[in-house]
Amino acid sequence: LVRQVLAGKTEDYPNGVTYRQGDKIVLTPNASLFSDFAKTGPPDYDDYYRLLTELGDKAQGLDRILLYEGSRGCWWGEKHHCTFCGLNAQSMKFRAKAPQQVLKEIGDLSQRYDAVRFRLVDNIIDMAYIDNLFGKLAEDHCDLDVFIETKSNLQKRQIKTLAAGGVKCMQPGLESLSVNQLRAMDKGVTPMQNIACLKWSLYYHVMVSWNILLGFPGETNE
């Protein structure tokens, strides 16, 4: 899109881009999803860090966290779409980079920008990342500070691995401690599993960001 605009080719745009043509709004939907994540590299933050350098002292104290995307879609939503979720309107299909690729790209970003804080923007991490990404980061004694979103039915061993691999905060999608509400949401977890997730996260010093969702049809005070 940017290349076409810079070249002055404004008579047509790539599929998936909404644009104005006279008094009309035109959109040609994408015929297919972008699915081959292996072909994409890490994000380029060169301009951002160049600007920070130019700002000098004015940029001191800024909370610098690099955003990184390892997957799109939701592997749980492919099987059981949580009834409250409005994400992934285009497709729930789960597509993920291989753990080895993510490991290399995060390592390259950390080295290039002298950064240790990362926020994975995936709706839900690939479960293979627990052992094959964070387990490897733990083995290599990488001192990172990572945020992830994941399903809440994690085992003690898995939370221990995540913590050792640098996960300092996570959003496990607890949503409720009521069995009736969890069933209504089609979350695929029990209140006890959610409590266990909170317990072992506290034990391994992983901060948990979570919510209680209210207002479901048929909900009672109990």
Description of each model-found segment:
Residues 1-100:
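Acidic, low-complexity intrinsically disordered segments
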